[in-house]
Regions:
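Conserved acidic/glycine
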Residues: 1-80, 88-89, 231-240, 246, ...
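Short, charged N-terminal helix-start/capping segments
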Residues: 2-20, 98, 104, 157-175
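Hydrophobic helix-cap positions at the C-terminus of alpha-helices
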Residues: 11-15, 90, 94, 122, ...
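Short coil/turn connectors at secondary-structure junctions
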Residues: 18-22, 68-71, 96-102, 125-129, ...
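General beta-strand structural signal in soluble alpha/beta enzymes
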Residues: 25-26, 105, 131-133, 164-168, ...
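Residue-level signal for short, function-critical loop segments
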Residues: 28-30, 107-110, 135, 198, ...
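Thiamine diphosphate
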Residues: 34-154, 157, 164, 172-178, 245, 261, ...
C-alpha cells in the first residue's frame, strides 16, 4: 500500500496531461489508504472553493484540505455504494463527453462487498476504473472480524469486466499499474482491481526485464526456479511472500531443488487457461500457467 501511495505521488510530481486526467476518490479512507501525498499536490474537488480549515485555525496537520474546482480528489463519506457509482460514471467519461479520465478508488478491501451492485453495473456498462482494495486479508483484524477480507479474491475472479491483481512487491505493483492505465484505454480491456496490504514485505533487489515484466502481467513467474528434480514447489499470492521465503530457507537443505512460484493474478491465469483449454484435443498453444509448470515433474508435490 505504501508503494501505491509513492507511485501516485510521483505521478502528481510529473504534472503531465496523463496525471491531470487522474481522478481519485475514497469513502472516508483517503489518508489510511495512502492517498495523502496525492491530495496535497492535486487538491480536493468541490464546486465551491474553500480554504484549509486546519491552517486557518493554525491547527497542525500533514494534510492540505483545500477545495477547488480544479481539485482531483473527491472525498466521500462512509458510502462504498457511492464510491462505485462515482467510479462507474467517471469511468464512462470518454463515451459520454469524449474526454478520458482515469478514475482510481481506494477502499478497505473487506468493504468492497458493500458496493457490489454498483460495481457490477459499472462493469456491465464497460466503465473503466481502477479500484484498490487495501488493507486486505487479516491486516485489520484488531478492528474486528468484519474488517477481515477473505472472500474478495473470488469477487475479482468472478466479476466480468474486472481484471484482478494481487502483487507482493513494489516493482510488481509499478509494472501492473503502468499496464493497467493502458488496459483501461484498450478497446478489449476493462477495469482493474488491485488487492494490496499494509503489511511490510522485504523487497527483492532486482531490475525487471521485459520477460519478467510480461510474466508478472500474465499472472505469475518463478521467484525461485525449481532444480532438475524438485520434490516440492511452493505457490503463493500476495503478502504470503514473507512466509514462503522463510519456509523455502528452512526447507532448503532437505529440498534443494524446490521451486517458488509467485502468482500475481490468479484471475489472468485462470481466464487464459480456460480460453485455451476449452477442448484439449483442439488445443494449439499452451496457456501461461502451463508454460510455467511444464518444467515441473508430474509427481512433484505442490504446496
Amino acid at each position: 500500500q505504501n508503494a501505491f501511495g509513492k507511485i501516485l505521488d510521483q505521478y502528481a510530481k510529473n504534472d503531465t496531461e496523463f496525471s491531470n486526467r487522474i481522478v481519485t476518490t475514497s469513502p472516508d479512507v483517503s489518508v489510511s489508504t495512502n492517498l495523502g501525498p496525492w491530495i496535497n499536490k492535486k487538491g480536493l474537488f468541490n464546486r465551491n472553493e474553500s480554504s484549509d480549515t486546519f491552517r486557518d485555525r493554525k491547527i497542525p496537520s500533514t494534510q492540505k484540505w483545500i477545495f477547488s474546482t480544479s481539485g482531483q480528489h473527491i472525498e466521500l463519506g462512509i458510502a462504498e455504494m457511492n464510491l462505485f457509482l462515482l467510479l462507474g460514471a467517471a469511468g464512462l467519461s470518454h463515451e459520454l463527453f469524449g474526454e478520458r479520465l482515469f478514475p482510481i478508488g481506494t477502499v478497505y478491501d473487506p468493504f468492497i462487498s458493500r458496493g457490489l451492485d454498483a460495481m457490477n453495473y459499472a462493469c456491465y456498462q464497460d466503465a473503466r476504473f481502477m479500484i484498490v482494495g487495501t488493507p486486505s486479508g487479516i491486516s485489520l483484524a484488531p478492528e474486528g472480524g468484519a474488517h477481515q477480507s477473505i472472500g474478495t479474491p473470488l469477487i475479482g475472479i468472478s466479476q466480468p469486466g474486472l481484471l484482478s491483481y494481487e502483487p507482493a512487491f513494489a516493482d510488481e505493483l509499478s509494472a501492473i499499474m503502468n499496464y493497467g492505465f493502458n488496459y483501461l484505454q484498450d478497446e478489449n480491456g476493462g477495469s482493474i482491481y488491485l488487492r494490496l496490504s499494509t503489511r511490510s514485505i522485504d523487497q527483492p533487489l532486482r531490475n525487471l526485464d521485459k520477460n519478467l515484466t510480461n510474466d508478472i502481467l500474465k499472472g505469475g513467474y518463478w521467484l525461485k526456479k525449481p532444480g532438475s528434480n524438485p520434490e516440492i514447489i511452493i505457490v503463493y499470492q500476495g503478502v504470503m511472500a514473507n512466509e514462503v521465503i522463510k519456509a523455502t530457507g528452512y526447507l532448503g537443505e532437505r529440498f534443494k531443488d524446490a521451486g517458488v512460484l509467485s502468482i500475481t493474478s490468479s484471475d489472468n491465469l485462470f481466464n487464459e487457461w480456460k480460453k485455451k483449454s476449452i477442448s484439449f484435443n483442439l488445443q494449439t498453444s499452451k496457456s501461461h500457467i502451463e508454460h510455467l509448470l511444464q518444467v515441473v515433474p508430474r509427481d512433484t508435490k505442490i504446496i
